[in-house]
């Protein structure tokens, strides 16, 4: 399952140089420290839960699954957000993740 948030896809079409610069920035941030890719994706997933971004939560869940994260690790990352972002935001994010996991199984 491939997923690209609609707004980012639109940005890439309209402003390809801006999108390319952002992608380069994101890549440099990822290389700047000792965290492995799976840990990076799970941290970013928690951040996406915090801002309540469905597209980012689903995109990062897809990326984490495509890497080495298990479905249970992804669920755990979302569950951990509850004490910081609140139960309602966590539970809706968990549903977004479950949709991705279900789609991956099909």
Question: What name fits each language-model region?
Answer:
Residues 22, 42-49, 77-84:
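Short alpha-helical scaffolding segments that buttress acidic/His motifs in well-ordered protein cores
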Residues 33, 50-54, 68, 85-88:
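Residues at alpha-helix boundaries and short interhelical turns
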Residues 52-80:
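Mid-chain, well-packed structural core segment of small domains
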